[in-house]
Amino acid sequence: MPRRREVPKREILPDPKFGSVELAKFMNVVMLDGKKAVAERIVYGALAQVQTKTGKEPIEVFTLAINNIKPIVEVKSRRVGGANYQVPVEVRPVRRLALAMRWLREAAKKRGEKSMDLRLAGELIDASEGRGAAMKKREDTHKMAEANKAFSHFRW
């Protein structure tokens, strides 16, 4: 454990178009090599596609998608007496958001549409309706935790 003082969390400014801190954070997740303008173009393009395809408010679809993807429990490896056990643990709120955003990005990358903004739009719509690759990732994580419920007493 470091003996120095704890470094304060940096405050992320809300994005200029929708005024959402979550969306600004997601843009940072999408960003590669510090190219924020490209990330903004992708995310705003995806949200515009969501608007045209669903007719709903894009920020609401985004929030709903993120909330649907957020995992509640995950498994962590714990070594006990020469054996590794997958111990289910509850996910902290900050990590929930981070995992949801990461899974959303990865699921969008693997889709078949031509451009990233179309892929992201499709994944956002799917996740907001409770389907898609990101939702499957969450369900798989929950299934793993459920299957290893017997080892929950190894929590630390």
UniProtKB/Swiss-Prot annotation:
The keyword Ribonucleoprotein appears for this protein: yes
CDD domains: uS7_Bacteria (cd14869)
Top-level taxon of the source organism: Bacteria
One Gene Ontology term of the molecular function aspect: tRNA binding
SUPFAM superfamilies, alphabetized: Ribosomal protein S7 (SSF47973)
Protein name as it appears in the record: Small ribosomal subunit protein uS7
Subunit field text: Part of the 30S ribosomal subunit. Contacts proteins S9 and S11.
Role summary: One of the primary rRNA binding proteins, it binds directly to 16S rRNA where it nucleates assembly of the head domain of the 30S subunit. Is located at the subunit interface close to the decoding center, probably blocks exit of the E-site tRNA.
CC per GO annotation: small ribosomal subunit
Higher taxonomy: Bacteria, Pseudomonadati, Pseudomonadota, Betaproteobacteria, Burkholderiales
GO biological process, one term: translation
Keywords recorded for this protein, A-Z: Ribonucleoprotein, Ribosomal protein, RNA-binding, rRNA-binding, tRNA-binding
NCBIfam families, A to Z: rpsG_bact (TIGR01029)
